[in-house]
Amino acid sequence: VDYDTYADGEALFGWLNGTYAIKKEESFETLATAFLANLGERFDSLNLNVGHVKFLLQGKEEGLVGNIVGKKETATLRKLDNASEKVFLTVNARVEVHPDKLVEIVKEEVERVFNVVGYKEETLNALIPGRPNPTFRYREIVKL
């Protein structure tokens, strides 16, 4: 791996991780579909490259996982049959935009979609990743 090239590429992407407590568990599939579509539309309208956007909307009986790995057409939503004591939303995103703008977009879309059921932001972190510094590294290409 050329770590200089890798670091240059990674530095273009804002990273975001957020968790939200959801107050009422209702219309989860509708909410997840809207959240996924809205994020895809926003990123496409700003012509932003999406590395990935993932979210889990977890209810007491089932969860919904949304993914975008490029343009909005790549968006997928699937159900999980796992139960939870808590009702929450977890968002993980890597998008070619400054982290502050990524936070702004995600916060606006969370508010737009989840305000009808109520939510509370628990954690929200965004950053530009630092240069990788692997513990073990080959000095030359290893041929297998």
Q: How should these model regions be labeled?
A:
Residues 2-144:
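P-loop NTP-binding site
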